[in-house]
């Protein structure tokens, strides 16, 4: 009893490749950072794309302590300066077209954007 293999005559249409897009946003100003994150998330919701985030990464606090007196004489007084760097990550499952649409978002000054695209692996 051997079974004849079934031949598929229908051609399968290739679906657009789904990519995993990781967007990393960094800034010293948390308000402008949150505004850009909100713009990206609303664009993803309007395009009906799966989005996770913004994931808040712990802040980096860079500190520098210097002497106030330039000559080194006098009372030992010190200035303490610090800079806080805020970071957010957004993960999106989408096609390449979403990245083109994302270019229309206005990014405020001082916000750095890093986009990493990976192919989503198909499950067997």
From Swiss-Prot:
GO biological process terms held by the UniProt record: translation
Keyword Ribosomal protein: yes
KW Cell cycle (keyword) present: no
One Gene Ontology term, aspect cellular component: extracellular matrix
Keywords: Ribonucleoprotein, Ribosomal protein
An example molecular function term from Gene Ontology annotations: RNA binding
Pfam families referenced in this protein's UniProt entry, alphabetically: Ribosomal_S10 (PF00338)
Family: Belongs to the universal ribosomal protein uS10 family.
NCBIfam families: uS10_euk_arch (TIGR01046)
Record's protein name: Small ribosomal subunit protein uS10
Organism: Dictyostelium discoideum
